[in-house]
UniProtKB/Swiss-Prot annotation:
InterPro entries: PurM-like_C_dom (IPR010918), PurM-like_C_sf (IPR036676), PurM-like_N (IPR016188), PurM-like_N_sf (IPR036921), PurM_cligase (IPR004733). This is Phosphoribosylformylglycinamidine cyclo-ligase. SUPFAM superfamilies: PurM C-terminal domain-like, PurM N-terminal domain-like. Belongs to the AIR synthase family. Its EC number is 6.3.3.1.
Length: 368
């Protein structure tokens, strides 16, 4: 049916049902569903309260008290991000309870690399037709991510927009604000040749490169419910939807206890070559021993099944390392010990060297 005729038919049907005129619901927006979602998520939001933020959702804006949070002369740092086409996996698999963790992780990990403590988070959830149960599952993940990061979920926007999205589709965006006391921001200005590069393990693909992941799955002829070829105990969807690791609390602990971290890089889109140079002085480069990278099975499978070259893997995925720390050589063992005690798997990946050309220099080969 042509679009104009279809719209006319819908209008005629609506008018025949309601002789008194059209309603917002006739246009596809269900205010009652929105209210039902708010009631479902109120306890989830309440569970993320922290010093500085103890209000209820529903106001025109969220409040945060920096003094109550213990800051005296803070610099505020803001970040926003999304989850990319990892959402398509969640939508097609009907599994929505973890992408909210990804959303928070992508934002708060970008804050902590600047030495900031995440304080509060806001989300934007847009869909064509609101399903309160689906929305509640998504917000439950967001609340869990906030709990892991120690930040408060102080507000958000749920947008039901008929005609903008296909049935079942949705999009997410996150916004996080953190703070650090003046003079304690990262990177520091004392990075020198010989500083050690530590790598913190990832949980999997995290939230970057999923357009390539989905293409490889497509050409492999696999279904999301099939056992994952690289993890037979879980379905392919479950394995690929493993949430992005949130590094906030272990890193903040290491910063406070050692004062040995000079720089941090969140390994997202662009991998090592695009992200590590962003935190280094122009005169220095990172020399990485690729044989020290513990490549996770999912990346070996993606490389083999998709015929993806090692260099392309390194500039698309994290390949098993989700966060990089640059530390003074004499404090590397201490920093690594604190991170490991906090539950991180840490590898010594290389060191800082004088830069001659590229910002990242590889030694050895990636063991895919």
């Amino acid at each position: 049916m042509p679009i104009a005729r279809e719209r006319k038919a819908r209008l005629e049907n609506a008018m025949s049902r309601k002789k008194t005129g059209l309603s917002y619901a006739d246009a596809g927006v269900d205010i009652d569903a929105g209210n039902a979602l708010v009631e479902k998520i109120k306890p989830l939001v309440r569970a993320t309260r922290r010093p500085g933020a103890d209000g209820e959702i529903g106001g025109f804006g969220g409040l945060f008290d920096l003094k109550a949070a213990g800051f005296t002369d803070p610099i505020l740092i803001a970040a926003n991000d999304g989850v990319g086409t990892k959402l398509k996996v969640a939508i097609e698999a009907g599994k929505h309870d973890t992408v909210g963790i990804d959303l928070v992780a992508m934002c708060v990990n970008d804050l902590v690399v600047q030495g900031a403590e995440p304080l509060f988070f806001l989300d934007y959830f847009a869909t064509g037709k609101l399903d309160p149960d689906q929305g509640a599952a998504i917000v439950a993940g967001i609340a869990e991510g906030c709990r892991q990061a120690g930040c408060a979920l102080i507000g958000g926007e749920t947008a039901e927009m008929p005609g903008m999205y296909r049935d079942g589709d949705y999009d997410l965006a996150g916004f996080a604000v953190g703070a650090a006391e003046r003079g304690r921001l990262l990177p520091t200005n004392d990075i020198v040749e010989g500083d050690v590069i530590l790598g913190l393990a990832s949980t999997g693909v995290h939230s970057n490169g999923f357009s390539l992941v989905r293409r490889i799955v497509e050409v492999s002829g696999l279904d999301w419910n099939d056992p994952a070829p690289f993890d037979s105990d879980r379905s392919l969807a479950e394995a690929l939807l493993t949430p992005t690791r949130i590094y906030v609390k272990p890193i903040l602990s290491a910063i406070a206890r050692t004062h040995g971290i000079k720089a941090l890089a969140h390994i997202t889109g662009g991998g090592f070559p695009e992200n590590i140079p962003r935190v280094l002085p122009p005169a220095y480069a990172a020399e990485i021993d690729l044989e020290a990278v513990n490549v996770l099975p999912v990346f070996s499978w993606l490389a083999e099944r998709g015929g993806v070259a090692a260099q392309e893997m390194l500039r698309t995925f994290n390949c098993g390392i989700g966060m990089i720390a640059v530390v003074a050589a004499g404090q590397a063992a201490q920093v690594a010990a604190v991170l490991q005690k906090e539950g991180e798997h840490v590898e010594i990946l290389g060191s800082i060297v004088p830069r001659r050309d590229k910002g990242v220099i590889y030694q050895g080969a990636l063991e895919l």
